[in-house]
Design a protein with these regions (language model features):
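Catalytic phosphate/metal-binding cores of nucleic-acid and nucleotide-processing enzymes, i.e., regions
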Residues: 60
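RNase H catalytic domain
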Residues: 63-144
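RNase H-like nuclease fold core
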Residues: 1-57, 68
Length: 145
C-alpha cells in the first residue's frame, strides 16, 4: 500500500494576505507542493472573520489544492491511500462532519465543504482516505472516511 501524506497550512503573510501551503509526500519523498495566495473569495474571510479564523479557511483551501493535485493521474498513479493532516478545528469539521453542522452564515466554510467532498468523492473509489487532526507532531484524533 502506497500512502500519500498531505500536510496543509493556512497563514497570513507579513502583508496581511491569506496564503495556503500544502505538500504531498510518498515514502517521505515530496511528489507535489505549492504555496500561493488564496482566491479573492477566501480573502474576504480575513476581513470578515479576522486573521486567526481566516487561517482555518486557508488551511482547508490548501487541502482543496492538494486534493486537486491528487486527481492528476501523474501525481497519484501509485497511490492507494491518502492521509490528510490538519490542525484546525474548522478543517477537521469540514473534512469529517456533514455540512449541516456548519453554521448557515459561514458561507466560506460551507463552500469549502462542498469543494472538499466533491474531490474526496472522485478519489474515494480508488483510494482509502484517512484524516488526522494534529497538534504539533501529536495526533489528537483520526478518522477513516
Amino acid at each position: 500500500m502506497t500512502t500519500a501524506t498531505i500536510s496543509a497550512k493556512g497563514y497570513t503573510n507579513e502583508d496581511g494576505i491569506l496564503m495556503s501551503r500544502y505538500s504531498i509526500r510518498c515514502n517521505d519523498i515530496p511528489i507535489a507542493a505549492d504555496k500561493r495566495p488564496t482566491n479573492d473569495v477566501q480573502q474576504v474571510a480575513v476581513e470578515q472573520f479576522g486573521r486567526i479564523s481566516a487561517r482555518s479557511i486557508g488551511e482547508i483551501v490548501a487541502v482543496i489544492q492538494a486534493l486537486e493535485a491528487l486527481t492528476d493521474a501523474s501525481v497519484c498513479a501509485a497511490v492507494d491511500c491518502v492521509s490528510i493532516h490538519v490542525s484546525t478545528a474548522l478543517a477537521w469539521k469540514i473534512l469529517t462532519q456533514p455540512v449541516s453542522t456548519i453554521a448557515v452564515h459561514a458561507t466560506h466554510a460551507r463552500h469549502c465543504h462542498e469543494q472538499v467532498h466533491n474531490l474526496l468523492d472522485k478519489l474515494r473509489p480508488s483510494m482509502t482516505i484517512e484524516i488526522l487532526r494534529t497538534k504539533g507532531t501529536t495526533v489528537i484524533d483520526s478518522r477513516m472516511i
